Amino acid sequence: MKKHIASTLFLSLLSILQLTAQSHSVKKLGIEQGLSNNYVVSITQDKQGFLWFATEEGLNKFDGTRFITYYKNDLPHNNQGITGNELNRVYADSKRPIIWIATQRDGLNAYNYDEQTFTAYQHNPENPHSLITNDVTDISPSTQNDDGLWVS
């Protein structure tokens, strides 16, 4: 009798778990789908739901259907452009419509996706408040200042 109750309880729990289980779909995204490079170093999602990919060959925005790629000197998207194509990290600002982009040897970029403009932050030896180096490897939000970032 105890075995019957235990097996009935087990089967009941198993069927409940199957009912609550969610199916996940996996979609392959690569060069064939429009990604600029298959070597993705960082991914973030902005407040509008778009995915942003940092690669060894540009910044990529995915809208669920297609990619838009931002390259250095790609001025049709804006009047300044991203400062480098070899990227280390992307971070979506949680308070502002900004994607922060860490580059290899070309500083930090802020892309305002509402205004579609880039702002570059680079090392300037004459400015003690500028970045200490143009090789930015990581970005993290500050827990002490709502608008602050830690960069390394």
Give, region by region, the residue ranges found by the protein language model:
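Carboxylate-rich, polar loop motifs that coordinate divalent cations or form catalytic acidic clusters
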Residues: 1-152
